[in-house]
Amino acid sequence: MARYIGPKCKLSRREGTDLFLKSGARALDSKCKAENVPGQHGQRRGRLSDYGLQLREKQKVRRIYGVLERQFRGYYQEASRRKGSTGENLLQLLECRLDNVVYRMGFGSTRSESRQLVSHKAITVNGQTVNIPSYQVKAGDVVAVREKSKNQLRIAQALELCGQRGRVEWVEVDLDKKAGTFKSAPARSDLSADINENLIVELYSK
């Protein structure tokens, strides 16, 4: 399945906000002006139609979590079948992805790096190696770095960065063991207010 491997800054500029696709605790640097669209001359973005706003919000969330369109639509369909708010269900499904949980626990400095750790069999769930980034982690699951991968420098650096930006409340991590417990799926109030999931629901409901 194809995946974008181009400049991360370009994606953030396209969405007009920092998507935190690059490692490090700081936001976009001065060379990546989020208010300008990608291109040699970086023209400022114009006003968008309602459809344009909905599309941009969907693209933004897709890129934050590193999910391709077909898979993202599948998450929406699953979210719509569940009880409660479709938008909140969608965000919870994305947050429960194994690659995202690895990122939230601080074992990877970005979701992309976390996805690579999972794909390279460096991560276990409840003691079993899982190499599927989209695997849905459940409340109470223990996610850990495999013993032979614990000495990787990038994991130590990622844990340090996570300590600087702060770890989310719905995971509990033992830094010495490089293992963590996924306590529960996050509530909507725990997630970024910069995401307007209702726009995505409106887009797919048409």
Swiss-Prot record:
Pfam families from the UniProt entry: Ribosomal_S4, S4
Gene Ontology molecular function terms on file: rRNA binding; structural constituent of ribosome
Keywords: Ribonucleoprotein, Ribosomal protein, RNA-binding, rRNA-binding
Domain of life, per lineage: Bacteria
InterPro entries linked to this entry: Ribosomal_uS4 (IPR022801), Ribosomal_uS4_bac-type (IPR005709), Ribosomal_uS4_CS (IPR018079), Ribosomal_uS4_N (IPR001912), S4_RNA-bd (IPR002942), S4_RNA-bd_sf (IPR036986)
All copies of domain S4 RNA-binding, residue ranges: 96-156
GO cellular component annotations of the record: small ribosomal subunit
Entry's Gene Ontology BP terms: ribosomal small subunit biogenesis; translation
Family stated for the protein in its record: Belongs to the universal ribosomal protein uS4 family.
Main function: One of the primary rRNA binding proteins, it binds directly to 16S rRNA where it nucleates assembly of the body of the 30S subunit.
Family annotation (NCBIfam families): PRK05327.1, rpsD_bact
Quaternary structure and partners: Part of the 30S ribosomal subunit. Contacts protein S5. The interaction surface between S4 and S5 is involved in control of translational fidelity.
Protein name (database record): Small ribosomal subunit protein uS4
Species in which this protein is naturally found: Pseudomonas aeruginosa (strain ATCC 15692 / DSM 22644 / CIP 104116 / JCM 14847 / LMG 12228 / 1C / PRS 101 / PAO1)
